[in-house]
């Protein structure tokens, strides 16, 4: 930690599902909370209780029974700017308790995002929060930093978007980036659907959060899907029980691995797309023939949706099947990969060589929001 917390840079990783925020130089984010804004569904009757017209993050999560929950970031793209401002305000003033006008701020975004998205981010940071300087970094690149590499292919899968980003000697190769709008939130929705087939009905935005918890606690990736299905059909060894908030206990069996299997077979949710193993392979094949070997040997996983037990072994198996037989394939799954984007941001923002990369308030005033495309790439 820097001695003077007065001028330390802030790092804010705005995920579709979780906001990770903290100070550059720390080894973990100080604040991790859901990217949710909740609004009451009912009329307040108790006068003087100080009810608010909206709740953010954990508070929205704890009062979810009476709220309608909305995620302002969908598939990595900010779709509701008013709610996003609320989330940033909450991050700075309630979670980190800092004055944003005193700290340079590093934000993150998904690769291949619309240009307007980062322009608007830049504009809000400078005009609403008056930050002295800011920067927008690509999430997958930060994950590679966090793993201590400069070359590799990152599979970054969060709540809203999954992407493969090949990076060679610190340069992302934009022509080979693959983006797949299938991630944690879609898996939660799919789990809601297949639990309905078992007779458990989850419909509201609050119940979706329960299903997300079931997914995080009980789901895993099968090494061989067909075999696992056969095992599940013939015995109850794979069944697990889960206690709902009201004390009712439900049992789930093959749903545990059918849910994340969607990552490898997107047709499960009606998506016409290759699975994550194929997009990884396709991305490597779009790179120059001389660097493929280095990419195969450095497959870095990052993001919350890569946290399923068994996912690294399955990726190893699938990519080995696609790649040339002599190729050495290595999947790197760091235990802290849930936060590796944030950790990479923390490393980047505290490098002395990075200090001239910030977009200053002065540069913004001279050039306007489009400065972000020139300074951040």
Curated annotation (Swiss-Prot):
Modified residues (N6-methyllysine): 86
Post-translational modification Methionine (R)-sulfoxide, affected residues: 46, 49
Alphabetical keyword list: Acetylation, ATP-binding, Atrial septal defect, Cardiomyopathy, Cytoplasm, Cytoskeleton, Disease variant, Hydrolase, Isopeptide bond, Methylation, Muscle protein, Nucleotide-binding, Oxidation
Position(s), cross-link Isoglutamyl lysine isopeptide (Lys-Glu) (interchain with E-272): 52
Modified residues (N-acetylcysteine): 2
Top EC category: hydrolase
Source organism, top-level taxon: Eukaryota
Reported modifications of this chain: Oxidation of Met-46 and Met-49 by MICALs (MICAL1, MICAL2 or MICAL3) to form methionine sulfoxide promotes actin filament depolymerization. MICAL1 and MICAL2 produce the (R)-S-oxide form. The (R)-S-oxide form is reverted by MSRB1 and MSRB2, which promotes actin repolymerization.
Keyword Transport: no
GO biological process: actin filament organization; actin filament-based movement; actin-myosin filament sliding; actomyosin structure organization; cardiac muscle contraction; cardiac muscle tissue morphogenesis; cardiac myofibril assembly; heart contraction
Cellular component aspect of the GO annotation: actin cytoskeleton; actin filament; blood microparticle; cell body; cytoplasm; cytosol; extracellular exosome; extracellular space
EC number(s) given by UniProt: 3.6.4.-
PTM-bearing positions, type Tele-methylhistidine: 75
Reactions that this protein is recorded to catalyse: ATP + H2O = ADP + phosphate + H(+)
MF terms in GO: ATP binding; hydrolase activity; microfilament motor activity; myosin binding
Keyword Hydrolase belongs to the record: yes
Subcellular location: Cytoplasm, Cytoskeleton
Miscellaneous section: In vertebrates 3 main groups of actin isoforms, alpha, beta and gamma have been identified. The alpha actins are found in muscle tissues and are a major constituent of the contractile apparatus. The beta and gamma actins coexist in most cell types as components of the cytoskeleton and as mediators of internal cell motility.
Cited PANTHER family: ACTIN
Entry's disease: Cardiomyopathy, dilated, 1R: A disorder characterized by ventricular dilation and impaired systolic function, resulting in congestive heart failure and arrhythmia. Patients are at risk of premature death. Cardiomyopathy, familial hypertrophic, 11: A hereditary heart disorder characterized by ventricular hypertrophy, which is usually asymmetric and often involves the interventricular septum. The symptoms include dyspnea, syncope, collapse, palpitations, and chest pain. They can be readily provoked by exercise. The disorder has inter- and intrafamilial variability ranging from benign to malignant forms with high risk of cardiac failure and sudden cardiac death.
Subunit structure: Polymerization of globular actin (G-actin) leads to a structural filament (F-actin) in the form of a two-stranded helix. Each actin can bind to 4 others.
Protein role: Actins are highly conserved proteins that are involved in various types of cell motility and are ubiquitously expressed in all eukaryotic cells.
Homology family: Belongs to the actin family.
Listed name of the protein: Actin, alpha cardiac muscle 1
Organism: Homo sapiens
């Amino acid at each position: 930690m820097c001695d003077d917390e007065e001028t330390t840079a802030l790092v804010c990783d705005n995920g579709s599902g979780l906001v990770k925020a903290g100070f550059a130089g720390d080894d973990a984010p100080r604040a991790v909370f859901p990217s949710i804004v909740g609004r009451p569904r009912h009329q307040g009757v108790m006068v003087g209780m100080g009810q608010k017209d909206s709740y953010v993050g954990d508070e929205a999560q704890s009062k979810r029974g009476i709220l309608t929950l909305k995620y302002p970031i969908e598939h990595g793209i900010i779709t509701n700017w008013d709610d996003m401002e609320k989330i940033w305000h909450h991050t700075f003033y309630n979670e980190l308790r800092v004055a944003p006008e005193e700290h340079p701020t590093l934000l993150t975004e998904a690769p291949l995002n619309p240009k307007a998205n980062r322009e608007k981010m830049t504009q809000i940071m400078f005009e609403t929060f008056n930050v002295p300087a800011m920067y927008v970094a690509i999430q997958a690149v930060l994950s590679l930093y966090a793993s201590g590499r400069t070359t590799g292919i990152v599979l970054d899968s969060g709540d809203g978007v999954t992407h493969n980003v090949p990076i060679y000697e610190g340069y992302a190769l934009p022509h080979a980036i693959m983006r797949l709008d299938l991630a944690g939130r879609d898996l939660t929705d799919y789990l809601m659907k297949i639990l309905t087939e078992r007779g458990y009905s989850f419909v509201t935005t609050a119940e979706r959060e329960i299903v997300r918890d079931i997914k995080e606690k009980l789901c895993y990736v099968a090494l061989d899907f067909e075999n696992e299905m056969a095992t599940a059909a013939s015995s109850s060894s794979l069944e697990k029980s889960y206690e709902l908030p009201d004390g009712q206990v439900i049992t789930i069996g093959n749903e545990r691995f059918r849910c994340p299997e969607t990552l490898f077979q997107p047709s499960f949710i009606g998506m016409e797309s290759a699975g994550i193993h194929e997009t990884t392979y396709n991305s490597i094949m779009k790179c120059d023939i001389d660097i493929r070997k280095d990419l195969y040997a450095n497959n870095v996983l990052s993001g919350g949706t890569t946290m399923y037990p068994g996912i690294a072994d399955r990726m190893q198996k699938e990519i080995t099947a696609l790649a040339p037989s002599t190729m050495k394939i290595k999947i790197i799954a760091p235990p802290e990969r849930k936060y590796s984007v944030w950790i990479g941001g923390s490393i980047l923002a505290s490098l002395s060589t990075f200090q001239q990369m910030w977009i200053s308030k002065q540069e913004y005033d001279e050039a306007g929001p489009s400065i972000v495309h020139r300074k951040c790439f």
